[in-house]
Amino acid sequence: MSLTIPSPIAATTPSAASMTAGEPKTYQVRTFGCQMNVHDSERMAGLLEEAGYVPADGEVADVVVFNTCAVRENADNKLYGNLGQLRQVKEANPGMQIAVGGCLAQKDRETIVKKAPWVDAVFGTHNVGALPALLNRARHNNEAQLEILESLDVFPSTLPTKRDSVYAGWVSISVGCNNTCTFCIVPSLRGKEKDRRPGEILAEIQALVDDGAVEVTLLGQNVNSYGVEFGDRQAFSKLLRACGEIEGLERVRFTSPHPAAFTDDVIDAMAETHNAMPQLHMPLQSGSDKVLKDMRRSYRSSKFLGILDKVRDRIPHAAITTDIIVGFPGETEEDFQATLDVVEKSRFASAFTFQYSKRPGTPAADLPEQLPKAVVQERYERLTALQDRIAAEENAKQLGRKVEVLVTAQSGRKAGETHRLSGRSKDQRLVHFSVPAGAEAPRPGDFVTVTITEAAAFHLVADPAGADDYLLRRSRAGDAWDRSQADSCGVPAAGAASGKAGVSLGMPSLPTRRA
């Protein structure tokens, strides 16, 4: 589907200083939603840079691209709120262009241009590669361009990618999903599952490692169904084991699996592959078997708890995280109590908790017994209070433990106020740590081994008593970070873990306390 829609605002001529001939246009990509969207945004940035655009330094860019989410209602509100704010900016900057892509664009299509006629281009999840051409066409024709494909045009992995992190990277192993969860609109927007061949995936991982990356996260809507297209039920566990053979790749993670298809061979591969991290994100959604049936989740709470038992038997210190929806249509107090019971038994390190949001086009939107907002809010608060307590108790078990932390790039006021650096442990816990006086500071991508001295619900703190309690391991990734700073004319302080922050997970932020 390709439409050209007249847009009076798009018809302005490029006269801003930044659009002067010979001067490169600037861009900004704003991402809403999941990890898949974060990775897609890296591709959008890569496409724009290949077309000659450069990242914007300030707030105003020649091109602003929104990569949207359609999972919850507030995603719509967030997009249109941002578009409204940009209207006056665009009027004050002739030649500026705005593009909207992602899941909401795939779903709403013409609605976006009707609600925000100052948008220049709308594209979907299946034709990310069309972005530069749509912008050029909109500029040339002085009309908004809308192009939505109903199936995948080119597998996204073939597109250029601008990675926001030199030490860690996302690698898609599949796109789309064959499940039919009643609350989820993603399969209708991203299509049926399509799997990449193992050789292509491993080649991309090797290229990342060659560029300095030490950590990779394998991405898919349902990673453990990987291989369905070429008939290999153990393809994902084989892929994990193959990652263990890549020299220089120190950490491998994946997200997200589905409990219904999570098999013992994957657990064995996690336990037996040296660089597979002791961390698992396993979406629960509900602890009520009745609600799980209404959600069409294809497993029950006993199976879910059985998976956790098997994982912890093979990987005793594994940190397990989850997703939970509160207030699904028809959820009773008894159903909700079943969720609380499963959460108590599961001992999650953290949980992404969501209030059910009615999404037109999903089967759940037509279910009877949609719950009042006040009931959903009250249950949500009880669930988060329980999970916060459990997270604090689980983190308290880390006190006195030595952990290896992959240092991340620092940004924001808090990093300057506390004089601590931050990173992720092998089990993905957030660790804030200080560098002893006289010790060498790490770079993003380096590793430090420290002892946990404080614990809170959402982070750990390590304040070494002296240099003997702090071990720095400089890495290829740290070297790559130094090169990236030199290439971008950055001038970091010697040894300081500062600079541009890495890619956000694109997931709801957990509240944090000051370290």
Curated annotation (Swiss-Prot):
Reactions that this protein is recorded to catalyse: N(6)-dimethylallyladenosine(37) in tRNA + (sulfur carrier)-SH + AH2 + 2 S-adenosyl-L-methionine = 2-methylsulfanyl-N(6)-dimethylallyladenosine(37) in tRNA + (sulfur carrier)-H + 5'-deoxyadenosine + L-methionine + A + S-adenosyl-L-homocysteine + 2 H(+)
Protein known as: tRNA-2-methylthio-N(6)-dimethylallyladenosine synthase
SUPFAM superfamilies in alphabetical order: Radical SAM enzymes (SSF102114)
Domain called TRAM: residue spans: 396-466
Sequence positions that bind [4Fe-4S] cluster 2: 177, 181, 184
Residue ranges occupied by any MTTase N-terminal domain in the UniProt entry: 25-140
Location of the protein in the cell: Cytoplasm
